[in-house]
Amino acid sequence: MAISIKGVNTGVIRKSNNFIALALKIKEPRNKESLFFMSVMELRDLLIALESRLHQKHKLDAAARLQYEQARDKVIKKMAENIPEILVDELKNADINRRVNTLELTDNQGENLTFVLTLHDGSKCELVVNELQIEMLARAIIHAINNAEMRELALRITSPLDFLPLYDVDCQQNGNLEYDTYSQPEWKHNLFDHYLAVLYRFKDESGKEQFSG
């Protein structure tokens, strides 16, 4: 059965200065609670999908944008009234089987985003996020990381959300080109509708000009 969101809470599990996981606790409409633990990569995947939908909302005309924002604010207020409690013991004795190994956006149509979470024990959970809940969910994730005084991590996982790297190339001194490719799942490709190539020039430590792209 799909998990819908009534309220969310987040907390960071860390060891010394090292980020281990983000705890994401969800209160469902019938007050059942589900707890997941997400690594940096899965958080980035989630945020990329959320940011893509927010980008669509930013392109609305003024009247539609106002209508969306008013509806969003009502939902955010309701979510704030239904924040589930995260117990210290749930963080200290985190169940590894609740760790999210992979996250996939399987439905991006309509008002809801549907994700399939594959957990450490091999089980799968379907998580449904309404577009009016996106900002509250994203805010809760970033707030938890900042609250753990890991602002560099917050910047790292939020900065590359508006593009998807596919290739890079270095121009070698002998004139050859050295390519690297980045394999991305199809659902990420589907979030973007145009491609850009960037070529830049820089000087290396010896002062020689180099080219990359």
Residue locations for each model-derived region?
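Extended intrinsically disordered, low-complexity coil regions enriched in Ser, Thr, Gly, Ala
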Residues: 14-21, 25-67, 113-157, 204-213
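Intrinsically disordered, low-complexity charged/polar segments
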Residues: 156-169
